[in-house]
């Protein structure tokens, strides 16, 4: 599964062995894997993730994932 972290999320990844600082990486999709599991595995605080995209479709944190999926995680964006 392809995972992409946007904006400041790559620097927020704190899990040991995570791809800290990398915006794109691959993880193995296992049976029953949901978006929330991936967020936990890479160590990104779930409250930092505002938008979840799976294969170009906006989904929630409890969406099931499969091998070959493309997961994009986006933080809230602000500015003026």
Regions found by a protein language model. Name each.
Residues 1-79:
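Ubiquitin-like/PB1-type beta-grasp interaction modules and other compact soluble beta-rich domains
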């Amino acid at each position: 599964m392809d995972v992409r972290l946007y904006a400041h999320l790559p620097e927020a990844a704190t899990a040991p062995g995570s791809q800290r600082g990398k915006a794109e990486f691959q993880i193995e999709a296992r049976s029953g894997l949901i978006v929330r599991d991936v967020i936990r595995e890479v160590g990104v605080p779930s409250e930092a993730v505002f938008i979840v995209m799976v294969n170009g479709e906006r989904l929630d944190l409890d969406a099931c994932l499969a091998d070959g999926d493309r997961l994009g995680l986006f933080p809230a964006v602000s500015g003026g």
